[in-house]
Amino acid sequence: MSSKLFARLGTLHWSWAAVFSLIVGGGLLTACGGGGQIEPFKPSRVLAFGDELSVIEPDGRKYSINAFKQVTGSGGTLVDDPTTLDCARDPIWVQAVASAFGLAFDRCLGTATVASGQVLAQVGHKVSDLPAQILGVQGAVLGEKDIALVMLGMNDILEIYAEYPRLSRDALISLARARGRALGRLINDLALRGPAVVVLTVPDISLSPFALAQNTSTGDPTRSKLIFDLVKVFNDNTSIELINDGRLIGLIYADIETQNMVEFPSSFNLSNVTAAACKDTAPLPNCTTATLKDAVPPAAAPTATSWLWADDLRLSPAGHSRLGQLAASRAVNNPF
């Protein structure tokens, strides 16, 4: 019996006598006279759930800074073809995890010839939308050969924040707590249906250009602190609710990693962690490396890899790259 099946039996609150009866009577013992090594986890399908931080549009555009296809120029060097986007360049975090297992999403095959992943995430979606996303999975039923990637909650936090000051801070904190716990329960349900699950908490958007601007535009310098509190309460309650046996769910603290990138930008080769790189005339997902803001001397012009934020809320490829590295490492090394 796989370690994951043992984990699921345990979460169902069965008696161990009943489990033993099921094992012996149902033929679930797979070997006798000795054990064997647990095989490395090798999923055959990847599923992306969440909001725009995990979306690849049908035409390959992402809610970040999109890159162009590279072609060989007249001098024999690679140059960008400004007429053709390349969805495999500057990947978002879910693509990094898929690549770690040799999988590819149907909306961005890259060099793959067969799709082995589905993007169920949708722009603007919130915690309450996750069940419908799961129901939208096409093909085989969810199982142990699937890996599910989840990052959700940014739009919940923004929706809750928008109620201030009509609702008090304490009321908003209570709402964030409830949404976070609801997400944790939904993720548990997903994990118990079979797939390995990798979860990213909501990035710390209190450090985003949007939050920093709120301190000024509202005349209230504590607005970003309120957003920080909402993010923290939401993420803390999601993680508290998750099944914590080490085998069903792998958790990445994207909020803490965002804080690290802002506090120690040079460690991540970042030159700007406070401003949006994309021009206002090229809203996501229409932003490309050709629609970035002009340089404001003495600072250098933004690039996809040196600025943290694509727009006032969404991460650049640099941010996605770091989160993708962490998520891929967790997915590969977690004992699913």
Regions found by a protein language model. Name each.
Residues M1-T30:
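Sec-dependent bacterial lipoprotein signal peptides
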Residues C32-F336:
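Conserved active-site regions of diverse hydrolases
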